[in-house]
């Protein structure tokens, strides 16, 4: 009767079976032996009685059915008493009840497929009832024949094994006893067929055989259907007769059912005992199988991996598997599909039969648990298949499928699998659904990592080639994906929780995997990233899944960083890499140094078609979308951002710009610990970035949008430390590549900050002396922006935001206005803090927080609300930046960098001027409080950034295109420099999104500093899509910094942006106001400050970047750690390098890369 309980949901579906069983169980439930009671109730209980009794007594019956007599009276009074005595006299009633349970289990088998698929009510009840009932009657008849022999054995087994193994046995017993019960029911059904036909219409239940057996009772039992499942199989035949008589004599059901009850009791006894015997045997088998299930699943996973690698059929099988798994996950949308999947599950030896319902709601979270469970068999099979799928995708089939799924299935994936939503459908990306399921399940990712490591680097080349071959077709698919991404917005809303669960589970697992990976070495890292990325590839193929299912949030970051840029890079391999030898060298470089990185890149390239366009479109749409929509699509946001970026990428600025930088980013992402290796790779990539340099900036910005969302998801997951460390690992890697661009961008961005046409050299000379000038200068990081410093002495903190304050289009720039003032007040104290930070980053981060809190009273009011969330983020960043000198902090800080990139993006958007001190201090606090940090706030902040970025990006992309590739490159470089600097501050993620936003916000300023030399590698990095935003005239200096004169329109845009951003982000606006500083005052101050901070905040941004320079210098020894400060160093050193050609400690490699890139 526990059987009935578990089956209760199914029985609820089987209203007839449940109704009749409820009637029997209602009488039976009190006595615990539901069979006798059920038969009695079926025999003499009226329909109403059955309803009443089943409602109350059914639970008891479920609990156990041995004590039938005591509660039989309760169930049906005197009739129940008679029945109870009848049943009591014959222990067969327990067996009969067990048989009924077996019948109901048989029904469950029918139902369970639906139930396993997460569709309890999925199957049409009325239609299937007759068919199921007929088959059930046949099986019951055969059971009835065999009951006599095994009656007593089954009774004993029933008492012993049935209750023990009702859950596992019910399926087996259902399967085994199905024939017996069907035969028994058939014979009984023939008797009660005339009566059964009446209820047949009433029976909507899945189990038609049982329905027929219960059909006489079905009309009233429909209401009870949920309760009587357990005992129903027992009395199915008897009930059919008794219920038929009851249905006929509903007014007086007790009269007719009594003979029926006697007959049905005997029949149910026989069938139930046969059922019990079979069920006990099956239970024993199932208990054994349950133990074997895990190993079997693991073996099946391996087999599926191998088969998936070998066969495309694996795709289809995982397709079905993932389909039913997804159906389980999305019980609402794919119940029918779930029914199919449950059949698939049953087909699978490891079928998820027990845990299918679990997977339904929390499939992603449960998947990892279920992998350990027998229910995970199908999941693991599916995951293995999807793992194998990535392998074929790695290989030739990976090229084919990667291209196909990227082009055709990725949009579907975005719709169905990327969301992991109930909106999952068996589409072209059904295998990608398996990917999605796989990727959320970190075990599958890890399995891929372990099993696919060897395969993926080799197939990576094939995949790269296939991606290169299919990249352009994918770009149109990117648009499709964007449309689907929009459709996903609604889908993601329902599945967002699963995504968060996936993030929590997958992010932690992938964090562990990535953490394990990065220490292992570049190749191991690469291998793991290959496997993860192929796991992600499946997910990434529907980029929104990777983004939406940040379960593999680190993979998301990987795909965000590497994927977005590498998508661009792959696309740019086709488009931008004009020289095949260069492409070959870059690809070989990737494949050697980042063999798996390249696979990651390609994987991400695969998914960025949806991912980048999603990002750019998400960025562009985020302006359109409300804050709530962004929150809804946050899981999507990485997908949307990547999609959006990819949309821009088809504009080929992204395609050209992102190729090399994503590679560097991916290399860095893959081997954050292997900074020397990665640095060499980065240098190679920096050199290779020269041709494709412009793209990485945009790619970086897109990546940072993705990382932003990933950070938000990580924050939502509450594993900010792991995510941050991973993110920061990746971020410094990306920051290094970003630094390559950011170096130029820094000089450029310094010019950008120097909207006052302050030459980049001036800014960069101070930037070179940043740590030196930090102590001396009132704006410690204003060393880069001494001229800007005059306007925003406190804005050196915003050195990262140099370009950002230039353009109030950036929301963070509006915040930067507040932060600019705050930092202007704070900068004198913060300058010392910056110098100290270079010496004692943690200490100074605290000081920065204090300075932010103490020095700027006026600005603090505005900055502090931002700081409330952003202080946390900034403190996180500061902690990560200050602590990432420690290798362990490196990972944490890398993850924090990702997170902080997110938060820094938000922070930068909020108050880029206070970026260096306020942002870092706040990030420190935020890192500490990131888990408790309001996810909504961060989401809104990230949305705010994205929104700002999206319109600006679109405009600047168009303008960048208009302004020409070099200017675009130059413009994007400042953006990427800002993003790099911000990434240095916020980890490299921010440069893309925040810098893009800032650059977009003040493209004229930001892009003005960009030097034509930087356009090569930085060209499209962040600014290209946004360079169009610059309304100011660009006066490109051949030396490299392009002086941008911000026009009044741009300033108006700045002013517009802050209120627009706040208004576009009502939730963010509210949260900011709620955070302690009114957004209104922020907006007004932002408007004022934007006018001031157009130049003044440029200085502030420069200051922030300069602040990072000391930290970068301080962390120079840790550059190999690829800590956020490594990226900071890379970016800061890059900036001084472009300005002075100096190398700051470990920044030398990055600087060298940037020099060569330049």
Curated annotation (Swiss-Prot):
Residues 431-472 are annotated as: Required for targeting to small nuclear foci. A motif (LXXLL motif 6) lies at residues 500-504. Residues 548-560 have a biased composition (Low complexity). There is a cross-link at residues 111, 170, 195, 198, 372, 508, 756, 802, 850, 901, 931, 1105, 1115, 1154 (Glycyl lysine isopeptide (Lys-Gly) (interchain with G-Cter in SUMO2)). The modification N6-acetyllysine is found at residues 111, 158, 286, 310, 446, 481, 528, 606, 931. A motif (LXXLL motif 5) lies at residues 380-384. A motif (LXXLL motif 4) lies at residues 266-270. Residues 1-415, 753-1158 are annotated as: Interaction with ZNF366. GO terms for molecular function: histone deacetylase binding; nuclear estrogen receptor binding; nuclear glucocorticoid receptor binding; nuclear receptor binding; nuclear retinoid X receptor binding; RNA polymerase II cis-regulatory region sequence-specific DNA binding; signaling receptor binding; transcription coactivator activity. Its main location: nucleus. Residues 78-333 are annotated as: Repression domain 1. It is found in: Nucleus. It comes from the Eukaryota. A motif (LXXLL motif 3) lies at residues 185-189. A motif (Ligand-dependent nuclear receptor binding) lies at residues 1061-1074. Residues 37-47, 601-610, 723-745 have a biased composition (Basic and acidic residues). Residues 735-885 are annotated as: Repression domain 3. A motif (LXXLL motif 2) lies at residues 133-137. The keyword Cell wall biogenesis/degradation does not apply. Keywords: Acetylation, Activator, Biological rhythms, Isopeptide bond, Nucleus, Phosphoprotein, Repeat, Transcription, Transcription regulation, Ubl conjugation. Modulates transcriptional activation by steroid receptors such as NR3C1, NR3C2 and ESR1. Also modulates transcriptional repression by nuclear hormone receptors. Positive regulator of the circadian clock gene expression: stimulates transcription of BMAL1, CLOCK and CRY1 by acting as a coactivator for RORA and RORC. Involved in the regulation of ovarian function. Plays a role in renal development. Contains 9 Leu-Xaa-Xaa-Leu-Leu (LXXLL) motifs, which have different affinities for nuclear receptors. The C-terminal LTKTNPILYYMLQK motif is required for ligand-dependent interaction with RAAR and RXRB homodimers and heterodimers, for the corepressor activity, and for the formation of an HDAC3 complex with RARA/RXRB. Contains at least four autonomous repression domains (RD1-4). RD1 functions via a histone deacetylase (HDAC)-independent mechanism, whereas RD2, RD3 and RD4 can function by HDAC-dependent or independent mechanisms, depending on cell type. RD2 is dependent on CTBP binding. It is linked to Congenital anomalies of kidney and urinary tract 3: A disorder encompassing a broad spectrum of renal and urinary tract malformations that include renal agenesis, kidney hypodysplasia, multicystic kidney dysplasia, duplex collecting system, posterior urethral valves and ureter abnormalities. Congenital anomalies of kidney and urinary tract are the commonest cause of chronic kidney disease in children. CAKUT3 inheritance is autosomal dominant. Interacts with RARA and RXRB homodimers and RARA/RXRB heterodimers in the presence of ligand. Interacts with HDAC1 and HDAC3 via its N-terminal domain. Interacts with NR2C1 (sumoylated form and via the ligand-binding domain); the interaction results in promoting the repressor activity of NR2C1. Interacts with CTBP1, CTBP2, ESR1, HDAC1, HDAC2, HDAC5, HDAC6, NR2C2, NR3C1, NR3C2, YWHAH, JUN and FOS. Found in a complex with both NR3C1 and YWHAH. Interacts with ZNF366. Interacts with RORA. This is Nuclear receptor-interacting protein 1. It comes from Homo sapiens (Human).
């Amino acid at each position: 009767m526990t059987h009935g309980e578990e089956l209760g949901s199914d029985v609820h579906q089987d209203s007839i079976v449940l109704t009749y069983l409820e009637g029997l169980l209602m009488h039976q439930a009190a006595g615990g032996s539901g069979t006798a009671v059920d038969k009695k109730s079926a025999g003499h209980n009226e329909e109403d009685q059955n309803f009443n009794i089943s409602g109350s007594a059914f639970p008891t019956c479920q609990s156990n059915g041995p004590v039938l007599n005591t509660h039989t009276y309760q169930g049906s009074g005197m009739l129940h008493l008679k029945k109870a005595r009848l049943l009591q006299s014959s222990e067969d009633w327990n067996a009969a009840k067990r048989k009924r349970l077996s019948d109901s289990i048989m029904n469950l088998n029918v139902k369970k497929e639906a139930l396993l698929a997460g569709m309890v009510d999925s199957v049409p009840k009325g239609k299937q009832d007759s068919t199921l009932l007929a088959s059930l009657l046949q099986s019951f008849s055969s059971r009835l024949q065999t009951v006599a022999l095994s009656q007593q054995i089954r009774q004993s087994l029933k008492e012993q094994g049935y209750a023990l193994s009702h859950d596992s046995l019910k399926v087996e017993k259902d399967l085994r006893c199905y024939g017996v019960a069907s035969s028994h029911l058939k014979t009984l059904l023939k008797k009660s067929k005339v009566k059964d036909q009446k209820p047949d219409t009433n029976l909507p239940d899945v189990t038609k055989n049982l329905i027929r057996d219960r059909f006489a009772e079905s009309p009233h039992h429909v209401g009870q259907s949920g309760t009587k499942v357990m005992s129903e199989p027992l009395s199915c035949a008897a009930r059919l007769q008794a219920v038929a008589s009851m249905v006929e004599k509903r007014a007086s059901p007790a009269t007719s059912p009594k003979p029926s009850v006697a007959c049905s009791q005997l029949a149910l006894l026989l069938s139930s005992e046969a059922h019990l015997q079979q069920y006990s045997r099956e239970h024993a088998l199932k208990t054994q199988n349950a133990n074997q299930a895990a190993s079997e699943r693991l073996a099946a996973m391996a087999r599926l991996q191998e088969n998936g690698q070998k066969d495309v059929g694996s795709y289809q099988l995982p397709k079905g598997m993932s389909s039913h798994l997804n159906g389980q996950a999305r019980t609402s949308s794919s119940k029918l599909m779930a029914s199919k999947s449950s059949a698939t599950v049953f087909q699978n030896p490891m079928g998820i039969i027990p845990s299918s319902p679990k997977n339904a709601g929390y499939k992603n979270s449960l998947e990892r648990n279920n992998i350990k469970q027998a229910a995970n068999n199908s999941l693991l099979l599916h995951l293995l298949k999807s793992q194998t799928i990535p392998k074929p995708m790695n290989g030739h089939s990976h090229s084919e499928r990667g291209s196909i799924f990227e082009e055709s299935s990725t949009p579907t994936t975005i719709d169905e699998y990327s969301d992991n939503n109930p909106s999952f459908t068996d589409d072209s990306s059904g295998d990608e659904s398996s990917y999605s399921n796989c990727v959320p399940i970190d075990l599958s990712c890890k399995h891929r990592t372990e099993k696919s490591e060897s395969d993926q680097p080799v197939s990576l080349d094939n995949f790269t080639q296939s991606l290169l071959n299919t990249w352009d077709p994918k770009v149109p698919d990117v648009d499709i994906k964007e449309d689907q991404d929009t459709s996903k917005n609604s889908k993601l809303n329902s599945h967002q929780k699963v995504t968060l669960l996936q993030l929590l589970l997958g992010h932690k697992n992938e964090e562990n995997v990535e953490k394990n990976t990065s220490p292992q070495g570049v190749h191991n890292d690469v291998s793991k990233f290959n496997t993860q990325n192929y796991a992600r590839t499946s997910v990434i193929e529907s980029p929104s899944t990777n983004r939406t299912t940040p379960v593999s949030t680190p993979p998301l970051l990987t795909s965000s960083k590497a994927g977005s840029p590498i998508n661009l890079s792959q696309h740019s391999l086709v488009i931008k890499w004009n020289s095949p030898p260069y492409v070959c060298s870059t690809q070989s470089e990737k494949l050697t140094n980042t063999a798996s990185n390249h696979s990651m890149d390609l994987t991400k390239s695969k998914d960025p078609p949806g991912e980048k366009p999603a990002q750019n479109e998400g960025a562009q749409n985020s302006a359109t979308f409300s804050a709530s929509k962004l929150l809804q699509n946050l899981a999507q946001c990485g997908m949307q951002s990547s999609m959006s970026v990819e949309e821009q990428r088809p504009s080929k600025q992204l395609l050209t710009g992102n190729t090399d930088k994503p590679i560097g980013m991916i290399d860095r992402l893959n081997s954050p610990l292997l900074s020397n290796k990665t640095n060499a790779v980065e240098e190679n990539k920096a050199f290779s970035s020269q041709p494709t340099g412009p793209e990485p900036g945009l790619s970086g910005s897109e990546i940072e949008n993705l990382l932003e969302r990933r950070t938000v998801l990580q924050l939502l997951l509450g594993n900010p430390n792991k995510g941050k460390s991973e993110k920061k690992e990746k971020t410094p890697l990306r920051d290094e590549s970003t630094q390559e661009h950011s170096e130029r961008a820094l000089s450029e961005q310094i010019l950008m900050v120097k909207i006052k046409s302050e030459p980049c050299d001036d800014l960069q000379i101070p930037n070179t002396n940043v740590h030196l000038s930090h102590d001396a200068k009132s704006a410690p990081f204003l060393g880069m922006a001494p001229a800007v410093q005059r306007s925003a002495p406190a804005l050196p903190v915003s050195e990262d935001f140099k370009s950002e304050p230039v353009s109030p289009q950036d929301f963070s720039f509006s915040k930067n206005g507040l932060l600019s003032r705050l930092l202007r007040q704070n900068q004198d104290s913060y300058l010392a803090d910056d110098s100290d930070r270079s010496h004692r980053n943690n200490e100074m981060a605290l000081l920065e927080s204090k300075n932010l809190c103490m020095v700027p009273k006026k600005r603090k009011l505005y900055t502090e609300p931002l700081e409330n969330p952003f202080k946390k983020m900034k403190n996180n960043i500061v902690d990560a930046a200050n602590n990432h000198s420690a290798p362990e902090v490196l990972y944490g800080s890398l993850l924090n960098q990702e997170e902080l990139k997110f938060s820094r993006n938000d922070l930068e958007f909020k108050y880029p001027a206070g970026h260096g001190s306020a942002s870092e201090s706040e990030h420190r606090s935020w890192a500490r409080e990131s888990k408790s940090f309001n996810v909504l706030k961060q989401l809104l902040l990230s949305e705010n950034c994205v929104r700002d970025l999206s319109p600006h990006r679109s405009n600047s992309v168009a303008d960048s295109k208009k302004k020409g590739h070099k200017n675009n490159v130059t413009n994007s470089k400042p953006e990427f420099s800002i993003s790099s600097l911000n990434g240095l501050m916020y980890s490299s993620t921010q440069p893309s999104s925040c810098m893009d936003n800032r650059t977009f916000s003040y493209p004229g300023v930001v892009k003005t500093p960009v030097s034509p030399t930087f356009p090569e590698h930085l060209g499209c990095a962040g600014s290209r899509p946004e360079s169009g935003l610059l309304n100011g005239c660009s006066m490109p200096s051949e030396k490299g910094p392009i002086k941008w004169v911000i026009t009044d329109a741009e300033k108006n845009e700045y002013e517009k942006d802050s209120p627009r951003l706040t208004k576009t982000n009502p939730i963010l606006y509210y949260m900011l106001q709620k955070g302690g500083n009114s957004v209104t005052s922020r907006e007004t101050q932002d408007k004022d400050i934007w006018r001031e901070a157009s130049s003044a905040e440029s200085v502030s941004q420069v200051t922030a970047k300069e602040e990072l320079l000391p930290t970068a210098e301080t962390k120079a020894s840790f550059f190999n750690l690829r800590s956020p400060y490594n990226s900071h160093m890379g970016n800061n050193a890059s900036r001084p390098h472009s300005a002075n050609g100096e190398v700051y400690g470990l920044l030398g490699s990055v600087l060298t890369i940037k020099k060569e890139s330049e």
